[in-house]
A protein has these predicted regions:
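Catalytic-core segments of class I nucleotidyltransferases/pyrophosphorylases
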Residues: 126, 156-253
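A structural signal for short hydrophobic beta-strand segments in well-ordered beta-sheet cores
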Residues: 28, 149-151, 219
Length: 254
């Protein structure tokens, strides 16, 4: 069994964090005492993943190289790809196909923070012959603000809607995804069809629906704290939480 590799998606303009992101990639902003990118890298590191690619965008490439280098001081091997313009999560993921080379892949959005390790779920995914996609779900008080999933009694995802009105599910789809290498076949097919949304992006939701329609998407409902640090309020609130948890450095070697 090949080891799983990791992808951190760290592009985007960070418009919800303006003016902080006018001259800085949002993933370099601090979450309490560490850059945001340290938190997402730590999620991969905690799962035992050592081979990582970071997909960048915008104008802060040199800052990432200076901060992280090739990853050796963190016990990681870090490589980089560059998304020239905003084209969506699935398009960004397509840039990593040559790096992944047929392996399973754990993908995390660089502004997402997970309090606990998901290693037990990765161990299960690596031996799972039924599902090629794990999506991580968290119950939220206001489902209308998120992409929402529905599960059957076996944990299979049966339905997904983006920011639905008054849904009878409150399970938000977070920014952590496990995929088999089949994800690149689906992305390639979408690229060939030019299946971009009205906002000009190749949507990861459409790729996840392909897995769902084949009965290959599983929902993982987890209990630990999750934060999307994409707004100023969320950045402040999460920084206070991390301070109160008092766990020290998240990224080993930092």
């Amino acid at each position: 069994m090949q080891e799983t590799c990791g992808i951190v998606l760290a592009g985007g303009m960070g418009t919800r964090l303006m003016p902080l992101t006018t001259s800085m990639n949002k993933h370099l902003l601090p979450v309490y005492d560490e850059p945001m990118i340290f938190k997402s890298l730590a999620s991969l590191q905690r799962m035992g993943i050592k081979d990582v690619m970071i997909v960048l965008g915008g104008h802060s490439g040199n800052s990432f190289f200076h901060l992280l280098g090739d990853g050796h001081r963190f016990g990681l091997s870090i490589r980089y790809a560059f998304q020239e313009k905003a084209g969506g999560i699935a398009e960004a993921l397509s840039l990593t196909k040559g790096f992944v080379r047929g392996r399973n892949v754990a993908v995390i959005l660089g502004d997402n923070l997970f309090e606990e390790s998901m290693k037990n779920h990765l161990d299960r995914f690596e031996t799972d012959s039924k599902f090629d996609c794990y999506l991580f779900l968290k119950k939220v008080p206001d489902p209308s603000e998120f992409g929402i999933a529905w599960l059957d009694e076996n944990g299979s995802i049966t339905k997904m809607l983006e920011k639905p009105d008054n849904p009878d599910s409150n399970m938000a789809i977070t920014g952590l995804y496990f995929y088999s290498a089949e994800v690149f076949e689906l992305i390639d097919k979408s690229l060939e069809l030019g299946a971009y949304s009205d906002r000009g992006e190749l949507e990861i939701t459409d790729i996840n629906r392909f897995f769902m329609d084949q009965g290959k998407a599983k929902g993982i409902l987890f209990d630990c704290h999750w934060a999307d640090c994409g707004t100023i309020d969320a950045l402040i609130e999460t920084s206070v939480l991390v301070k109160n948890w008092n766990k020290g450095p998240w990224l080993i070697g930092a």
